[in-house]
């Protein structure tokens, strides 16, 4: 029991120290992913979050190294075969350029994806870009578009992401 408490304490401390030293942002996202197969579009939702324990800012340009964990729900297309649910763990590099109330961003992620229903684990790469709107000193809403390169389930999609913390 003490090991788990110590581990949680260390994780919280490391997270707090990284937030205090750099003030990175954390993000919570809800996305829609689509795959095209047999001339149909399959849509599913992705829930998750990411945080950037390491990052730099030079004037209006911010570079960060986010870690993202997400869960994608399964969905059923009209012909009856399911898009498998999946769990993702990815790390990446991200650049964000700030204007007065608007920011543009581009990210690249690489990681692993677990498909429990088909008992497969595979690598996935993802390119993401979009626009964000600052709603205050520590809050912004981003609208990302992404394409995921995956041997099992390549997908294109978009969503809404809320960023909190740091100087957004």
Describe each region flagged by the PLM.
Residues 1-4:
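Positively charged n-region of N-terminal signal peptides that target proteins for export
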Residues 6-7, 35, 100, 132:
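Short amphipathic alpha-helical "recognition" segments used for binding
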Residues 18-79, 157, 161-168:
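Short glycine/proline- and aromatic-enriched beta-strand/turn motifs that initiate or cap beta-hairpins
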Residues 22, 32-39, 122-168:
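Predominantly the C-terminal beta-signal and adjacent terminal strand-loop region
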Residues 46-129, 133-147:
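Gram-negative (and chloroplast) outer-membrane scaffold detector with strong preference
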């Amino acid at each position: 029991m003490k090991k788990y408490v110590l581990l949680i304490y260390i994780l919280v401390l490391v997270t707090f120290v990284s937030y205090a030293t750099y003030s990175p942002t954390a993000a919570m996202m809800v996305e829609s992913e689509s795959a095209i197969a047999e001339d149909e579009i399959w849509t599913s939702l992705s829930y998750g979050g990411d945080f950037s324990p390491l990052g730099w800012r030079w004037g209006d340009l911010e570079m960060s190294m986010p870690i993202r964990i997400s869960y994608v729900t399964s969905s059923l297309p009209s012909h009856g075969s399911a898009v498998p649910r999946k769990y993702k763990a990815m790390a990446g590099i991200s650049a964000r350029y700030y204007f007065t109330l608007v920011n543009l961003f581009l990210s690249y992620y690489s990681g692993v994806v677990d498909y429990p229903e088909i008992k497969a684990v595979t690598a996935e790469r993802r390119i993401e870009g979009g626009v964000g709107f600052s709603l205050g000193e520590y809050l912004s809403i981003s609208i990302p578009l992404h394409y995921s390169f995956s041997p099992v389930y390549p997908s294109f999609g978009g969503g809404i992401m809320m960023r909190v913390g740091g100087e957004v």
